[in-house]
Amino acid sequence: LGRYFKRRLVELAEKHPQVEDVRGLGLLVGMELSERRFAEILVEMSRKEGYLINRTAEKVLRFTPPLIVEKKDIDGLVEVMDKILIGIT
């Protein structure tokens, strides 16, 4: 499931220039954004949709999903993030 999660985030990064890098191992994945404000917006708006994302190093998002996460949960998060990123271009 970790590879699936990372692949979905890489697909998101390829679609949105605000995402500079996706890195990690297993389910512990980080996403670096081009600006601090993008990270702040993603954290806040994702929380309102029910997804908790940790922000580190000002513009890096750290994902630490529970071990019981399912593909549908990952897909939901990526869909929410996609909509948010479209809105902040």
Where does each model-flagged region fall?
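Conserved N-terminal phosphate-binding loop of PLP-dependent enzymes in the Aspartate aminotransferase
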Residues: 1-89
